[in-house]
Structure formats: structure tokens, C-alpha cells
Amino acid sequence: MMPLAGIAWNLMLLFSAVQGLPLQDGEGTQHPDLLNNPPKGSVEPVALEQLVHQAILKKDFLAQDVFFPGTTAIPTRAAPISLTEGVSDASGVLTTAVGGAFSLPPQLSTLIPPSPAPTGGPGPSPEAEEETTTTLITTTTVTTVHSPVLCNNNISESEGLLEAPEYGGSTFFGGLDCTYSVSVYLGYGVEIRVERLNLSKEEALSIEGLEEDRRFLLANETLMAEGQVIRSPTNHVAVRFQTYRATSPGAFRLRYQAFVLSCVFPPRPENGEVTVTDLHPGGAANFRCSAGFTLKGGESLVCLNISRPEWSGKPPVCAASCGGVIRNATVGRIVSPDISTSHSNNHGNNLSCHWLIEAAEGQRLHLHFERVSLDEDNDRLVVRSGSSPLSPVIYDSDIDDVPERGLLSDAQSLYIELISDNPAVPLLLSLRYEVFSESRCYEPFLAHGNFTTTDPLYSPGSLVSFFCNAGYMLEQGPPVIECVDPADPHWNESEPVCKALCGGEISEPAGVILSPDWPQNYGKGQDCVWGIHVQEDRRVLLEIEILNIRRSDALTVYDGDDLTARVLGQYMGVHQRFNLFSSANDVTLQFQSDSNDPVFSLSQGFIIHFKEVPRNDTCPALPEVPNGWKTSSHPDLIRGTVVTYQCEPGYDISGSDILTCQWDLSWSNAPPTCEKILNCADPGEIANGVRRASDPRFPIGSHVQYSCNEGYTLEGSRTLTCYNRDTGTPKWSDRIPKCVLKYEPCLNPGVPENGYQTLYKHHYQAGEALRFFCYEGFELIGEVTITCAPGHPSQWTSQPPLCKVAYEELLDDRKLEVTQTTDPSHQMEGGNIALAIFLPIILVILLIGGIYIYYTKFQGKSLFGFSFPASHSYSPITVESDFNNPLYEAGDTREYEVSI
């Protein structure tokens, strides 16, 4: 049996350890019944030891601090989340029932304590000697990963205020992630006004519109400013605020209100009209086409009341119809349909269309040919005066030329037939019809021109005067016609036509030159010459608006009044808009089309505007560029002057930044523009790591996140944000980080006495170097530079150096001072004068000294009658000897006698 003292000691340990410990089933501790009725074969001391050990573990366990998500053991830094359940009382796995955090799998380690030392009492029984008991201590490590505290809110009021969370003194370890979701009625949008905005670089604020499952960014913190109004085109927006700061989040205040959404105004179809009853949900848009055109699509659209109001369908189009009946006609057009989309096209590019135009009783029709382009071999146009295919033919394209003056019907109807059979050239047809009364003349028409009249009703006796648009000339008719014969009203002459001529002499201050037959295509084999003449003290400015000719055709511009003048330029093919200046008051233009081109394709032609401008020897002044400036190589813009454009920070130049004044006094390029830069430059990749960008174009507000490969750690900011600057180019929020090997840093070895370091800091990463210096008068003993060598832990390559007094340097400096003082070269000036003055004095002193020595040394008497108790020896102290004493300074090389 164990000694009584040992039993008492064990019981004391047991009660002190188990005090306050609930012993219940399932808690992992020994049941009380085991104390009274131990299992068969067990030994009492072993059971007692296990119970004591478990009690100690239990007490140790319960004494631990409770960890909140994202905290250490410091209670004041706990996140503001209530703890719903404490630590489990089980001695197995430790669990923390806290929302907003998650734990990594526990890491278990088993410790085997040493066996207790044997006591002095009797040993255990033989049965106990055969049974060995091992106590296992299981340690559970719980790693808590911090996650941001959520603070979401759903709002359905039509107006309100959104503000940043208030800081109540709690620590938001892991940051905040707040989403304010605002929803209003369908058919309404959300208008947000920024009343206050004060955020740091570690905070982000974004406003997004929501439409079904799609999100689209409306604004973020880089594009927001106080007073700004942001409108969502849908009835649902989300405001998200994120901060990575643990305390005192930034401030913002957004005031929102609902506003009525509307559909956009529908586009008016070409050759048609649209009327809208209301743009708000429920409103309708009605479409109709002009005569001769058919509506393709719905006649009416409704504005739908959805999250983003929109029309119930796509706007229709007005397509030229292939045939049809036009009753009670007044004024309109017949246009050739598109062969590829015509509903009557059932046989490739074949087309057969029939139109019937009917006027009211007692009226007639006038048909004018505005534009006609037919394939002579495959197209045919027939016009009949009547209402059936058997009516008399008044025009047949296979027989007649195009009637420039138009056609008159003999009755109240016209029957038009168009047939096209795989044409080789595009089919173009535009016929204008007009109804007029038999008691008056019809209204004249002049394509590419206009007219004036004395009677808007065109009654008999009225006069009409014609004139053409710029670039056209009146042909094939008089400039003035008269309505005659009251019994059968008609014009005494046909209307003239306005044509773009092939060449001519022009003596006007401004005008237009068109390619022959513009806007129709010019023919081949043409040679046209235009002469432009302005006042003698002026020159000509040519503005080429359109130049679209074949590559085998040429437009040549001469700087003079004939074809022998200097060539300003020769152009073929297609060119963008440009300008030319003449040096004098005459310019000649020549256009030649190739007559031998076997593959003659249709080309648009050209439009050239001209005007007289002051004659000078400088190029025209260049405009200032918004958000930029220009510099000139010469104050006067003479020939050869170079003008350079530059943009302000935050803007990029678009176009040519260098312009040169050419020989013809025109600029080599158009002035550029400065466009706002909305993207950051590529921050670059990192070695031994990867990056993830939210947008590969790096626009303002985008993010780039960096991470390192295994075995490396990130040094620097993990996330870079592209933010806008009012006065500069968009910039990243921080420098690009780098990935360094995972080594423990070296601690600062300290500063040597009488010395200093460069780049002083507490920790140095592996590979970093530290350099030492000594103050003046001290020399460095040891390595000047030491490096942090990687390892576990990292160590310095050598011990830090020492700073020792530099004795030799001090002596050398003093020798130098003495040498400089006694150097004869410094005493050459005035040496003769000094010798003449002091030489007699020195001789007198030597004479007196000799007499004194004679009497005192050899005669044993005092020269002046004084006696000394003893004669002391003295030794001369020279400069050489005083050099051995660093505290002694000599000023010259003379010897001194010292008597002590």
C-alpha cells in the first residue's frame, strides 16, 4: 500500500484540480462511478493518475481565452458579433460557434509525458507491473480566417438617405462589406445625388444598376464627386461599400429618390413619319410611310412598363414597294425597290413591278425623272397614259431618251412598268409625280435647283424663273417660262435642267465644282478642264470634300491659269477630305477618265469647294486644342514652319502631333485633339508570382491582385487600384509588389559606437545589405557591408564592424601641420629682412649665455651673486621627441631647455 503521505498528496492534487469541474457523461472525463467501483483489473494509482491528468487538461482548457473571428486574445479587438455559443466542454475537438468566420482544419499533436519517478514505498503488485499505462496529451490548434463583417440592407422606399456605417468604437477586424439594395416601382428609376464623399485609398464605393440577372456599373469612387447626380435606367440599384480598415470607416452620404422612366423617342423611318402619344409606359408610337413605300414591321409600338422601359418591338422601315395602286394622288415619288429584299423576287435578280397612279376627276399628272440609271440590255422602263397595260405608251427606255422635262398624262392616270433581268449595273430610279388642275399649269420642278414665281397657283399669265444650285448650270431650256392659253393652260417652254458640266470658266469669289453628271456617275473617256479666277490680290483655297474616283482616272490641280503651270497635286482613287492653296489668283483643274478601261465600274465622283482668301506667305492660323497647347518653330507661319501639339497630363493626343507648313501654304495634317485618358498603364507582371486583373484594359476603377508562387511571400500591396486624377494621368494606388523567398528576416545588428548605418530599420529581408560608416577621426574595423544571408533563420554574413580612434591619421595630420609651419618655402618671403634683424640679437644672446655657463659651470660661482641649492640636468626636447606624445603640439623646430 502506498504511504499515507503519498495518498494525501494525490488527493489534494485531485480536489484542487477538479474543483468546479462538472463531471457528466460525454464530457470526456472519468465518471464518478469509476472512483467507487473501478473496473475489474484496474489499479487504483493508475486510475487516480488518469483522473488527475484529465482534470488538469480540462482546467487548462477552460482557462483559455475565447477567440472572436479575426482577433487575437485581446478582448478589445473583437469584432462586433455576438457569441451564440461558447467553447465546447468536450476534451476532443474545440469548436467556436461564431458567424462571419470560418476555421481551418485543426492540427493535432500528441505529447507523451515521461513516466513518473518511483516513490520510496512498496512497488506495485505483479499484475500492475505487467500493465503499462501511457498518457496522451492531445493539443488542438484552431486557425481562424478573418472575413469582412456584413452589413446589408434592402430598401423599398421611394426616397431616402444612404450613409456609411457609424463607428461606435468597435474594431471591424477584416473590414466591412456593406450592400444597400434600393428598389422602387416598375416604370421608375433611381436618382442618386452625392452629398458627401470622404474615402481613403483602402475603401471602395460603387453604384450598380440591376436588370434581371445583369449588373452594370453606373459610378464608383474614382468617378464620383460631391454634387454629382447619378441616374439608373432601371428600378433597382445596388450601392456597395467596402473598407479594409479595422477602425473608423470613411464617410459618404447619398440621397436617392425615384423618378419616372420613359422610352427613348423612336427614330423616324426614312421616307416615312412617326407620331408618339406618350414616351412613358403605356404610350404608343405610330408609323406610316410616304406614298410609294411600304411599311416593313408593326404600325404601332407600345412603351412597356418594365424595369427598363422599352418599346414593344423594333421600329419599322419604309421600303420602296415593287408596284401598287396610288389613288387620289397629289404629290409623291416612285423609287426602285431593292432587288435583294423585294417580295416579288422569286427568280434571282429578276424584277417586274407595276404601278398605277390615279388622280381625282378632272385632274392630270406630271411625271418628272429625277434620277434614272438603267442597264441598257437588261432593264426596261415603260410609261403609259392610262390605267391599263394596253394604254398608249408615252415613254419606252428601249426607244426614247430620258425626258429631262418630264411627261404629261392625257388622262387622270399613269401606268408605269419596270422590268429588270439580272442587271450588270445597280438599278436606280426616282420618279416624281404631281397632280394639277386642267384650269392651270402644273407646278414646275427643277432638280438640283429652285425657282421663283409670280403666282403660286400657276394660273395663266404667271411667270417662273429658274436657277441652279452651286456647281450646276442651266441647260436645255430658258431661265424663265410663262403659263399661257387659258383655254388649255400650259407652259410656253419646258423647264430647263441643272447639270454638272464637264469643265468651264469660273470667275466667282466662291463656288463648287462637281464631277460630270453629279450625283450620277461620270462616264468614261472624259477630259474636263475648269478654270478658277479670283481677284488679283487674292489666292484660291480648294476644299476637297469628296474624292471617289477610279484608280485609272486622275484629278490634277495646277497652280496657274493653264495646264503648263506647276502641279499642286495629282490624285487617283479614294482620298479623305483635304485642302489645297494656290500661290496666285488662278487655279486650273483637269479631270480625265480612262476610256480604254475594259472593266469600267461606277464611281461616285468628287465635290470641290473653292473660295478666294487673302494672299500671303503664311499658312492659316491653327486653332488651339482644348486640354493642350502648341509650340511653333517660327513666330510667323511661313513655309517650313513646324508646329508641335502637346496635351496636358491626363490627356492623350489623337492625330498627328507635328504639323508642317507646306510649299502651297497648307498644313501637312489636320490639327489633333486631346482626349481624356481613362486607363492606367499596364502595371506589369511579377517574378515568381501571378496577377489577376478585373479588366485587361485597366480602366479607372479596375483592380489588379497579385499573389506569389509557393515558397515565396508578397512584399508590398496585394491589390492595386486604378484611380483618376483631375490634373494627371490615371495612376495605380501603389507600386507593384514583388515576391521574395520565404526566409525569416535578419534583425538589425545595432549601430557601432562612434558610427552609423545606412537605411536603418528593424528587420532586413534575405539578400538585403547593410552598410556601416564611422564618424570623422575613427576608423572602421571589420566589414563595411554585411548581407542578410537566407536561412532558417537568416543570418548576417559577418559581425558588425567597430569604430576605433584613428591614431596614425591624427599623427599624420599633426606632422603635416608642423611641416607646413616650418617649411622654408613658406618663409622665403621677407627672409632676408628677418635675418638682418634677428641675427645680431641671437649673437648677443649666445655671448651672454656663454659667459653665464663659464661662471656657473667652470668657476662654480653665480654671475649675479645668487647661489642655487643644486644643479639639475636638463635635456633638450626636440620636435622628434614631441611627436611621440600625441597630446603635445610644437610650433617650430627650435630647442628648449627646461629646468625642473
Curated annotation (Swiss-Prot):
Alphabetized InterPro entries for the sequence: CUB_dom, SEZ6_CSMD_C4BPB_Regulators, Sperma_CUB_dom_sf, Sushi/SCR/CCP_sf, Sushi_SCR_CCP_dom
Disulfide bond positions: C151-C178, C263-C303, C289-C318, C322-C353, C441-C483, C468-C498, C502-C528, C619-C661, C647-C674, C680-C722, C708-C739, C746-C788, C774-C803
UniProt keyword tRNA processing present: no
Any Gene Ontology CC annotation: neuronal cell body
Residue ranges crossing the lipid bilayer per the database entry: 833-853
Function: May play a role in cell-cell recognition and in neuronal membrane signaling.
Name the UniProt record assigns to this protein: Seizure protein 6 homolog
